[in-house]
From Swiss-Prot:
Any one cellular-component term (Gene Ontology): cytosol
Name this polypeptide is given: Pantothenate synthetase
Upper classification of the organism: Bacteria, Pseudomonadati, Pseudomonadota, Betaproteobacteria, Burkholderiales
Location, primary (coarse class): cytoplasm
UniProt KW Protein biosynthesis keyword: no
Pathway annotation: Cofactor biosynthesis; (R)-pantothenate biosynthesis; (R)-pantothenate from (R)-pantoate and beta-alanine: step 1/1
Pfam families in the record: Pantoate_ligase
Enzyme class, first EC level, given as a word: ligase
């Protein structure tokens, strides 16, 4: 496995190979990231993992400065699962001048849910991913479903810009107790880590209620289910930003929750740590 830090080195390394499969990451890797690399290997060609903590997707009050940076450990993990090339640019390499040209996704998808609580987040994500796509020129790019809204935004970007890239989605990797794996789980104290699986459990409760209503033909009151779920989290010491039942096709509120595929998404703070999760229904 080779590690490169400049765009020129990256392009030289890929010049004589088949089109690559790209796994974009911010580092601080866990088993969920490694599952993406393993999936990328199934698509032929070299597997490229990028490691870059992207300032553009962090608000000033967020955790850019303290986000874990563990490049040596990450490279060891990537080598162990068959990654061929790691692209780990510096900030000045990827952004040699102020990034005044940005990719602005549509508000109906990017300004709701995560976008409502993290203004500019998806603009930062789309801009850096577009730049990585231009650097790597992959045939396939692999993303996890844990960041469900991000996945949908990026699929839309690829479609509307006619990029010749297949976006592959991989199911959320979870700990044995159900907690979605995340680099930010490292921020949790021991008591918080014990409580953290309750976020997934709350989503399972919503999922079960929807499936039971569909089976019985009962009316689904999405707003009531969302409010009940948020109340459950608050009663356990969480500070929820949202629990939202949405159409999985476009993340809009369903006119008839019994008639179309759904996803329930949530974001909540436990102590100082903000966690997100989702379940398809």
């Amino acid at each position: 496995m080779r590690v490169v830090h400049t765009i020129n080195e990256l392009r030289q390394a890929l010049a004589a190979t088949r089109p690559a499969a790209l796994v974009p990451t911010m580092g601080s890797l866990h088993e969920g990231h490694l599952a993406l690399v393993k999936q990328a290997r199934d698509h032929g060609g070299p597997v490229v993992a990028s490691i870059f903590v992207n300032r553009l997707q962090f608000a000033p009050h967020e955790d850019f400065d303290r986000y874990p940076r563990t490049l040596e450990r990450d490279c060891d993990l990537l080598k162990g699962v068959g990654c061929n090339l790691v692209f780990a640019p510096t900030e000045s390499e990827l952004y040699p001048e102020p990034q005044t040209y940005k990719v602005q996704p549509p508000g109906e998808l990017a300004d709701v849910l995560e976008g409502a609580f993290r203004p500019g987040f998806f603009t930062g994500v789309c801009t850096v991913v577009m730049k990585l796509f231009q650097c790597v020129q992959p045939r396939v790019a692999v993303f996890g479903k844990k960041d469900y809204q991000q996945l949908m935004v990026l699929r839309g970007m690829v479609r509307q810009f006619a990029l010749p890239i297949e976006i592959v989605a991989v199911d959320t990797a979870r700990a044995d107790d159900g907690l979605a794996l995340s680099s930010r789980n490292a921020y949790l104290s021991e008591p918080e880590r014990a409580e953290a699986p309750q976020l997934a459990a709350t989503l399972h409760t919503v999922q079960a209620a929807v499936l039971a209503a569909v089976k019985s033909g009962a009316r689904i009151d999405a707003a009531a289910l969302e409010a009940q779920a948020m109340g459950t989290l608050r009663s356990r010491g969480w500070a929820p930003d949202y629990v939202a039942l949405r159409r999985s096709s476009d993340l809009q509120a369903p006119a008839d929750p019994t008639a179309e595929p759904l996803v329930v998404l949530a974001a909540a703070r436990l102590g100082k740590t903000r966690l997100i999760d989702n379940l398809e229904i």
